[in-house]
Amino acid sequence: GFIMEFAENLILRRMEDPK
């Protein structure tokens, strides 16, 4: 789906860039 991909992208970005 679209929402799932969007959420996954956000999570991946947050995990890669923890601040």
Swiss-Prot record:
Key words, A-Z: Membrane, Mitochondrion, Mitochondrion inner membrane, NAD, Oxidoreductase, Translocase, Ubiquinone
Main location class: mitochondrion
Any GO CC annotation of this UniProt entry: mitochondrial inner membrane
E.C. number: 7.1.1.2
UniProt superkingdom: Eukaryota
Bilayer topology term: Peripheral membrane protein
Cellular localisation: Mitochondrion inner membrane
One of the Pfam families matching this protein, by short name: NDUFB11
Catalytic activity: a ubiquinone + NADH + 5 H(+)(in) = a ubiquinol + NAD(+) + 4 H(+)(out)
InterPro entries assigned to the protein according to its UniProt record, in alphabetical order: NDUFB11
Stated role: Transfer of electrons from NADH to the respiratory chain. The immediate electron acceptor for the enzyme is believed to be ubiquinone.
Summary of subunit composition and partner proteins: Complex I is composed of about 30 different subunits.
Protein name, UniProt field: NADH-ubiquinone oxidoreductase 11 kDa subunit
Source species: Solanum tuberosum
